[in-house]
A protein has these predicted regions:
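C-terminal motif of bacterial Sec signal peptides marking the signal peptidase cleavage site
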Residues: 17-20
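Bacterial signal peptide processing site
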Residues: 22-25
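Extracytoplasmic "Venus flytrap"
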Residues: 32-57, 280
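Periplasmic-binding protein-like
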Residues: 41-46, 119-127, 221-260, 273-290
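Ligand-binding cleft/hinge of the Venus flytrap
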Residues: 58-69, 145, 160-187, 215-222, ...
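Short helix-initiation/N-cap motifs at beta->coil->alpha
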Residues: 74-85, 98-100, 177-196, 237
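A ligand-binding cleft/hinge motif common to bilobed small-molecule-binding domains
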Residues: 96-109, 170-171, 197-200, 204-224
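A conserved helix-loop-strand patch within extracytoplasmic ligand-binding domains
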Residues: 118-173
Length: 301
């Protein structure tokens, strides 16, 4: 439910004092009434390095503030679910979501609109990985042997770290994950944690975003000889930037189109690096209909 913003008595009293002095400060419009501060608040799912979210995504906020000539504030989220809850409560009006959390946001807020995705998000993949000690190697065939291993997902709300891997387990084995695995799977909470925990042997196998795995290998944080990619899924749509309909009330009719175009036009290296994307492209809610259908079959919460 969208929460209304109510001025406090203290704020009204202060506004009255300022009017008496003939000022127009603190958001007054000259009529003696305090005006609401116009801010676009933006958040993102904590898919990796959850302690450095603000530092990571501030360049996106800076780019949008400059491109749209408005104030933009990044608001960290402690979990996937928290990012959707903030959006539902209108505490944020723009979210960098995964496919699952994006669908959740669109479902819970009538009029919410998916604006953009990275080019690679239209053909995203998950990697199944295993500790080298298991003896499993890369194959085009689904790794059915992981049924006997200690396995971890990322977050239970992660598209590439849980929902789609579970979908492909079901598609290839005819069994739900709880039936397929001999031991109940774990949840690391984030893609990078999945890779690290498989590499150090905390878990024997896991599933994560292909992009995170490749980035960790390129940075030397993961040794592909120790955390071995054993299978990659078929492609699916994933990450997206979804906007709250109230932005049109705050910034005027047509603002969502302007926001979408600003994101598509983005060539700011720091902003694109924050999103781990080279280019953003237009999408709409229908782009994620396939994810919505999978979510009806695969449920963990």
């Amino acid at each position: 439910m969208i929460k209304a913003v109510v001025s406090s008595l203290i704020g009204i009293g202060l506004a009255g004092l300022l009017v008496g002095c003939g000022g127009k400060e603190n958001g007054e419009d000259g009529s003696g009434k305090a005006t609401a501060k116009k801010v676009l608040r933006f958040s993102a799912i904590p898919d990796e390095d959850t302690t450095a979210q603000k530092e990571r995504f501030q360049p996106v906020a800076d780019y949008l503030a400059k491109a749209l000539d408005i104030e933009v504030e990044f608001v960290p989220s402690i979990s996937y679910g928290a990012s959707v809850e903030k959006f539902e409560n209108n505490d944020i009006q723009l979210g960098w979501f995964g496919g699952v959390t994006g669908v959740q946001a669109m479902t819970r807020v009538e009029g919410a609109r998916a604006l953009v995705a990275g080019e690679k998000d239209l053909a995203f993949k998950s990697y199944f990985v295993a500790n080298a000690s298991t003896g499993l190697e890369a194959s085009d065939d689904f790794p059915a042997a992981i049924a006997d291993l200690k396995f971890t997902y990322g977050s239970s709300s992660s598209t590439s770290g849980c929902i789609m891997p579970s979908h492909f387990i079901m598609e290839n084995t005819g069994k739900a994950p709880r039936e397929f695995f001999k031991e109940t799977p774990g949840f690391s909470g984030a893609h990078d944690k999945t890779a690290m925990q498989v590499q150090d042997g905390t878990f024997q196998a896991g599933a994560l975003s292909f992009g995170t795995y490749e980035k960790l290998v390129a940075a030397g944080k993961i040794d592909p000889e120790k955390c071995v990619k054993i299978w990659e899924t078929p492609p699916y749509a994933d990450y997206n930037m979804t906007a709250h309909p109230d932005l049109e009330k705050t910034f005027g009719e047509g603002f969502l189109d302007k926001l979408q175009q600003a994101l598509v036009d983005c060539q700011d290296e720091a902003a694109l690096k924050a999103l781990s994307r080279e280019k953003l492209v237009k999408v709409d809610n229908e782009t994620f209909a396939g994810i919505a259908a999978v979510m009806e079959k695969v449920k963990f919460d």
